[in-house]
């Protein structure tokens, strides 16, 4: 079973991702949801995800900083940045920090 962490301060985004994952993978995946970067880090410690989808712009700690801390806890976590920011510098920084990909919202089902 894969554990997937979803972190975004917009509930509609996490709800949609959760729905897509559950419909596509059923019992093969378990999800946990965070509404802030700090909560994502806390969940990463206890939930120990295999995969994480992180928004960049969240209250408190942003997704890039959260990714850095999460990968410090477990370098094997596959992190995908999910954002509305079409910013080359953000994308470059995300990849430098170890993100698997930089996905632009809205993300279609096939990308997940």
Task: Give the predicted meaning of each segment.
Residues 1-3:
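Non-catalytic signal-transmission and effector/linker regions of two-component phosphorelay proteins
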Residues 11-32:
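Two-component/phosphorelay signaling modules centered on CheY-like receiver
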